């Protein structure tokens, strides 16, 4: 997606064919949390970007092509650290663990815990009922609805995790709380759109309504 008007965002662009790593490093030196993956594509430059992010040991949320790039590179898997949370759907989890989707779908908790055990990272495994695993605990999220199975919904979840960490919520707590907020926001969106017409932007609007009601 080409950048559109978003006045509240500070943007630093890059040329995928002539990427300047120093530009990324400059951002990593001041940021509190990193969300990487949605829309970046796969390839050597993207893998180098992910490697550089992991070197800074920052709280990091990895989704979509971030997970796909790591799945292709055992070297990157070895650089994962305890401040990382991945947010895969079943297909991404299948590639990450090199395990059939059907096997993962029938053993969500088992494979969520396997990610934590093997790589010492948190995992939000997205399905009809999302399974969240941290170092010591496992949670099943019950909020949300089938209308949220729409393009960009997972990207919204990635943003919620990163936003919670950015405002000071402890890393494990943010991992657990974000899917619940995401689901509740989707349920709020159901008050003014149907399941069949729900878009990711509706979920974002649901977040605004949800937080206003909490004040």
Language-model features: locations:
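Gly/Ser/Thr-rich beta-alpha loop segments that engage phosphate groups in nucleotides
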Residues: 39-43, 146, 154-157, 161, ...
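Charged C-terminal helix
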Residues: 5, 186-215
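N-terminal loops that bind phosphate or other acidic moieties
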Residues: 52, 169, 193
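Short, small-residue alpha-helix embedded
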Residues: 95-96, 150-181
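Glycine-rich phosphate/dinucleotide-binding loop and adjoining beta-alpha-beta core of small-molecule
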Residues: 1-143, 215
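Short, well-structured alpha-helical segments that form the helix of a local strand-helix-strand
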Residues: 108-117, 171-186, 200-208
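Short pre-catalytic strand/loop immediately N-terminal to key active-site residues, enriched for Gly-Thr
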Residues: 140-152
């Amino acid at each position: 997606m080409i950048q559109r008007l978003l006045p509240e965002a500070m943007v630093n662009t890059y040329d995928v064919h002539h990427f300047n790593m120093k530009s990324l490093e400059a951002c990593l030196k001041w940021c509190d949390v990193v969300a990487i993956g949605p829309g970046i594509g796969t390839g050597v430059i993207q893998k180098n970007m992910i490697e550089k992010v992991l070197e800074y040991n920052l709280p990091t949320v990895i989704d979509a092509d971030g997970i796909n790039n790591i799945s292709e590179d055992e070297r990157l898997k070895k650089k994962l650290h305890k401040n990382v949370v991945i947010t895969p759907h079943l297909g991404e989890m299948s590639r990450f663990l090199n395990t059939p989707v059907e096997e993962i779908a029938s053993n969500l908790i088992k494979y969520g815990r396997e990610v934590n055990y093997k790589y010492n990272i948190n995992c939000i495994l997205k399905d009809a009922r999302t399974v969240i695993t941290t170092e010591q605990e496992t949670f099943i999220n019950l909020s949300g609805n089938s209308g949220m199975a729409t393009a960009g919904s997972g990207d919204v979840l990635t943003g919620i995790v990163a936003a919670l960490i950015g405002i000071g919520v402890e890393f494990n707590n943010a991992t657990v709380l974000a899917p619940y907020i995401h689901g509740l926001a989707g349920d709020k969106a159901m008050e003014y759109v149907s399941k069949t017409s729900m878009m990711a932007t509706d979920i974002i609007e649901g977040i605004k309504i949800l937080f206003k009601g909490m004040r």
